[in-house]
Structure formats: structure tokens, C-alpha cells
């Protein structure tokens, strides 16, 4: 049983085991091991160090993940065993490899395995493509944030765990060399959940701080 990916608690109850000395390989995801993807394309830019735990009937199970290609072997499972897995799930910030020029000086936001985005419909129709994150953003989780699908008649609303940021900057181009800056928190939703509510702006990669305007 689990509510993953909304939280990091997973319970596996062994109802029966037809194989003697059976083993279970528990995948410890890359994001738990501070690896956004299995390459240097992206990396985390914060100082978070998510912890994880795996227990069998309350007893901790440990192993060298590198030796097991990211899997933690749980050996000799039997009927009646209860395996509990926990992953810390802080909100993380991600940067791209410097060779990805379009993403230089920008961050993305991730929680667990989910990438988040800002959609204008959740942010008073502000131009989220011009949103700039603070130098040191903070994040607040919002449970059961409702998204009503307006693109498909009769489609039910669905809920997600949203993220609200500390006040971000919205940049408005007033004249050729004149800009206005407004400060407002941003509401972020999981990337998979966007584009259900009509045409509007969406952004994943945000400039961080206003120093980019000097370049």
C-alpha cells in the first residue's frame, strides 16, 4: 500500500511465498541518491540530502547500492513479512548542464520523481514565462489542490499536491528599456497535470534572482 509519489511511505505485506529463500529487490530511485538522471545533463542545486530506510518486520535492511546498481536486496522473505520503505521527499531545485545554453542561470523544481511547473491559470493569469525565482526560494506544500479539466466535457476534477513558492518576481516589459517588477508567490503543479484548462502560459525553467538582467 502506498500514496507514492505524493509521499514516500510504502508498505509491502507478503501474503504468501511459494519460493524458498526468495529475495526482493527494492529500487532506490536516483532522486533519493542525489541523481536527477543517470548522466550529467541535470544536477540538484540545493544542499538537501534525502534519507531513505527499508525495514523488514521493524529490522533495518542495508546494502551497498552501487554494488547492486541502485537496488537494495531484501533476502529470505516469507509469508507474514512486512516490508516498509520510506523516502524523504523534500522540494528540490535542479540546474542543467552549462552546455544547455537556454537553461543557463535557471532552475527547475522537483519533488520526489515529479517535475513541477507554473501554469498561468493557477497564478492569476500572470505571465509565468517571465517569473523569476528568489535567490533562496522556500516552498510550501498544498494538499488536495483541485484541477478541473475544462477541455473534456464531463471530465471530473482531480487533485494533486501543489507547491507554493516564496514571493517570486514577475517581469513586465513596459518600454524598450523599461521594465516593471511585481512580487507574488507562485503556485506550481506537477508537470503531467498542465494543459487541461485552456490555452495559457506554462513554465518549467525559471531564472533565479534578477542579476540575469545585467547580462
Where are the regions that the model predicts?
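Surface-exposed beta-strand/loop patches in extracellular or lumenal glycoproteins
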Residues: 20-45
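Short, flexible loop/turn segments at beta-strand junctions in immunoglobulin-like
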Residues: 74-76
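Non-cytosolic beta-sheet module surface loops
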Residues: 2, 14-18, 28-30
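C-terminal beta-rich recognition modules with glycine/proline-rich loops and embedded aromatic residues
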Residues: 1-13, 36-56, 65-72, 86-215
Amino acid at each position: 500500500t502506498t500514496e507514492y509519489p505524493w509521499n514516500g511511505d510504502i508498505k509491502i505485506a507478503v501474503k504468501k511465498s511459494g519460493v524458498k529463500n526468495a529475495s526482493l529487490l527494492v529500487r532506490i530511485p536516483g532522486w533519493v541518491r542525489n541523481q536527477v538522471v543517470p548522466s550529467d545533463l541535470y544536477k540538484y542545486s540545493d544542499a538537501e540530502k534525502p534519507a531513505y530506510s527499508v525495514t523488514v518486520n521493524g529490522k533495518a535492511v542495508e546494502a551497498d547500492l552501487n554494488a547492486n546498481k541502485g537496488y537494495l536486496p531484501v533476502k529470505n522473505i516469507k509469508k507474514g513479512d512486512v516490508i516498509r520503505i520510506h523516502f524523504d521527499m523534500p522540494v528540490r531545485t535542479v540546474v542543467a548542464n552549462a552546455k544547455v545554453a537556454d537553461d543557463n542561470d535557471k532552475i527547475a523544481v522537483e519533488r520526489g520523481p515529479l517535475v513541477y511547473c507554473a501554469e498561468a491559470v493557477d497564478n492569476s493569469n500572470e505571465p509565468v514565462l517571465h517569473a523569476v525565482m528568489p535567490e533562496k526560494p522556500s516552498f510550501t506544500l498544498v494538499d488536495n489542490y483541485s484541477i478541473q479539466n475544462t477541455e473534456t466535457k464531463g471530465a471530473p476534477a482531480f487533485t494533486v499536491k501543489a507547491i507554493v513558492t516564496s514571493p517570486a518576481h514577475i517581469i513586465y516589459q513596459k518600454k524598450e528599456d523599461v521594465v516593471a517588477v511585481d512580487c507574488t508567490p507562485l503556485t506550481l503543479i506537477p508537470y503531467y497535470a498542465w494543459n487541461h484548462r485552456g490555452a495559457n502560459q506554462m513554465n518549467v525553467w525559471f531564472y533565479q534572482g534578477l542579476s540575469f538582467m545585467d547580462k
